């Protein structure tokens, strides 16, 4: 089968690789000059299935109000003048209940754990290298309230049989020796030993090369203007003056997926702006050995070979990609507070990207009401974590195979009204 994939981020490239491995003739189209040059370029570097959780959580609405008055707040909201933003935020608020949180986190952990398994198999099969580490993730708590609040997440981990360790301040140095100097600032930590790390952009670039070796064609620097429709199906992709035709089409355009298929269905994927800095390591003993997540600031600090990646925060501000100095200050403050002297933040590069987020946090992977149109988008802050599993899952669906995990509740149909022939999602 001929398959066209729109988008060459980590999710699009993973989809291409697994489809090609299944025997399909695959073409990837992207407006950029190469793979992983937008959202996948400089993310936090975590592959953290156990920490897969929606931003829509109990208590978040009240926290959001409090964060409005904090200098280093992890969340910021500025109205972008669109009705869609208001609809999306309303839908997100409706998911901030304990019941919805448990359902959504369960879906996310299921896909993320499967994706980690797919990544490990890929690594074993191909030997792909991407400055990866398998030292686990350590979530750090600065208050007793945060430590107590981890109970709801631990319950989900236990249900999913995800191994974990609850560490006291004195025990944190077992996972991250450099934290011994700052353990007095912390009340404890939750460690997931099965989590991994790696440079997402490097991985995507090397996976694209592997996909090419399987026959995948990459068309970079190519405009993606519209989908051509005929007889209720997709008939091609309009790329400038050319129409590219296939049997099946995959939209993996991240935050741009919503507007691209708005004439067919209203997919609730909104850009969640995040930031990162990447600093050179200057003192090995003071640097992290794997990755930590600061629960207070929602910031991840990840070790690459000779670099530290610090990323996080969320701004609901539309497609604004302006680099804000205050956000860099927050990232530098966090890493220098936990790992003082480990990296030289004065020499760090500064980046921002738009994560494609759904109101419930769960990505949209699978079929649509249009028979030959598939989606692989909406992974939010977990595109790297979920990429391989999402790619394999989509390849199975397109190939007519039974997926290895439950997939029905990951499709766009969960957002569609229960009306025959209806292709527009319900926001209320």
Curated annotation (Swiss-Prot):
Function: Oxidative deamination of D-amino acids.
Gene name in the database record: dadA
Binding site for FAD: 3-17
Catalytic activity: a D-alpha-amino acid + A + H2O = a 2-oxocarboxylate + AH2 + NH4(+)
Pathway involvement of the protein, from the record: Amino-acid degradation; D-alanine degradation; NH(3) and pyruvate from D-alanine: step 1/1
Database matches in Pfam families: DAO (PF01266)
Domain of life: Bacteria
Protein name per its UniProtKB record: D-amino acid dehydrogenase
